[in-house]
């Protein structure tokens, strides 16, 4: 894979990638000129086709992890019978410890009261409940009741989160 900023090989074109996705600009043909903002030089980067695919996959991964963290953070207080402010989540596209995409739900109480341990014990139930909650939600692209409002976490958050939850639920059954 050629490094970012390298020249294209003869006969192989480069792709233009929107750093902030085009769809986030609410472009309406003939009604606004939002496409101009989306296509400003500061929002564009030129990538080789392979790098472009990786960039798109990275955005989907971030969306899925963000949606998962949102769903789990909303469900966890119900299982723990605690205030939602007692727990917090962290999303890492490449965690330095796991070296993999990681969501951590943890308690915010100094010295802890056992929420983290209980969350670990409940992880299968939480993942099943999250899958059920997101699947049953009638929204199309995400909402505050499931994976967060559309566009606040990333593109296709609900779809990406559902895919991730299905995989995680299958793995926890093994």
Positions of predicted regions on the chain:
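Short, cysteine/histidine-rich loop/knuckle motifs that typically chelate Zn2+
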Residues: 1-3, 50, 143-148
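Histidine-centered nuclease catalytic patch
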Residues: 2-46, 55
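Generic recognition of well-ordered alpha-helical segments
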Residues: 43, 47-50, 129
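Extended, highly charged accessory segments
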Residues: 58-174
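Short, intrinsically disordered, charge-balanced linker/junction segments flanking boundaries
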Residues: 51-57
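Residues immediately flanking
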Residues: 19, 50, 108
């Amino acid at each position: 894979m050629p490094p970012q900023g390298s020249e294209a090989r003869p006969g192989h074109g480069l792709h233009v990638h929107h750093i902030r996705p085009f769809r986030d600009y609410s472009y309406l043909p003939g009604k606004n000129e939002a496409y101009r903002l989306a296509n400003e030089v500061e929002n564009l980067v030129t990538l080789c086709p392979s790098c472009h695919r990786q960039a798109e996959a990275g955005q989907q991964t971030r969306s899925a992890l963000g949606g998962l963290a949102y769903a789990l953070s909303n469900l966890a207080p119900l299982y723990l019978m605690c205030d939602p402010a007692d727990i917090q989540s962290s999303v890492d596209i490449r965690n330095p410890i796991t070296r993999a995409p990681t969501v951590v739900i943890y308690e915010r109480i100094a010295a802890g009261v056992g929420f983290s341990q209980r969350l670990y014990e409940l992880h299968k139930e939480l993942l099943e409940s999250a899958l059920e909650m997101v699947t049953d939600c009638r929204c199309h692209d995400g909402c505050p009741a499931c994976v967060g409002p559309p566009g606040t976490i990333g593109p296709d958050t609900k779809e990406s989160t559902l895919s991730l939850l299905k995989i995680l639920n299958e793995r926890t059954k093994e």
